[in-house]
Amino acid sequence: GQYRKIRWQVNREIKKVIKSSSFINGPIVKEFQKNLQEYLNVRHVIPCANGTDALQIALMALDLKKGDEIITTNFSFASTIEVILLLGLKPVIVDIDPRTFNIDPSLIESKITERTKVIIPVHLFGQSCRIEEIIEIANKNNLQVIEDNAQALGSQYKFLNSEKQMTGTIGDIGTTSFFPSKNLGCYGDGGAIFTNSDNLAYKMRGIVNHGMYERYYHDEIGVNSRLDSMQAAILNVKLKYLDKYNKSRQQSAHLYNQAFEKVEKIQTPFVESDIDSHVYHQYTLKVPSEFRDSLAEHLSKNNIPFGIYYPLGFHEQKAYKQEFFSDKDFPVTNKIKDQVISLPMHTELTRKQIKHIADTLSLIHISEPTRQERI
């Protein structure tokens, strides 16, 4: 659906790339970089190969030492903790807000030690975390902030003084992903890093290209993480429509909300409207835990796609158990992981489709939860 509407523009730009033979670091990459800088109102954008690399490169640019501690959320996609461990750093994970599922800022300060260097908050499902509070904590403790903005590109954060700023441009560094399902998605993998620091931008531009600033002279330990010209061309077309795409997601979310407003046992996404414009990368419901799996089965039988984001917190994932996280530190995550279920959310959803999904949900009985399992 989305491709059909912009097919002629996308095909034209792809043909230009093929004709130019500039498949790596072609002029279109710089053009997209400039346009994204203008859209975000940020000084520097560094395109890269994917969102995971973006996080890793951001950490590499900060001259951290093995064993330095990085504070982040317990509830997100694996990339956030993965890159910390890959670089020999220590993840210190924090429980989440039960309403938004974002990192709970009130729990951060108690986790800070003399080894803490960075906070990585995630703007989950399209909604900004309480980044202003996190920046204050970071400034107070001389820490740096990397915003994981893979799921909220185009969202604006509203400060207490009513000023607005794009998520991903507020901390020292921001990162994003252009995975196809993202709000701004390419037709493969892609990512980008944002910063207002000239020094950090210079360093990261070297890191993404094997540590080179001049060909075959390697000044940094780097990686091979360049956004290819084909993906840049596609993203450059779609960037013009990002606000429209996000508006479409918001309208679909509103229709879902209306459909579920009289269903007591279904909690629609909580929106912190005083600080954020939710752009709904996911539309995630919260339901009684004993009902969630039967609801998922019901949707599956009726050929309605759904997602469980996420079935486990980082502290329970097999790959990270060597970090010896304590289960008792994550009461909210332990509860939420059994309650969340995400419904179809994309730019081409129709009223008819949303009504069908909502009507299908209404056909299954939601039993009264026990006292211990109440939301």
Model regions and ranges:
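PLP-dependent aminotransferase class I/II
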Residues: 12, 29-34, 39-43, 106, ...
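Positively charged, low-complexity/disordered segments
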Residues: 368-371, 375
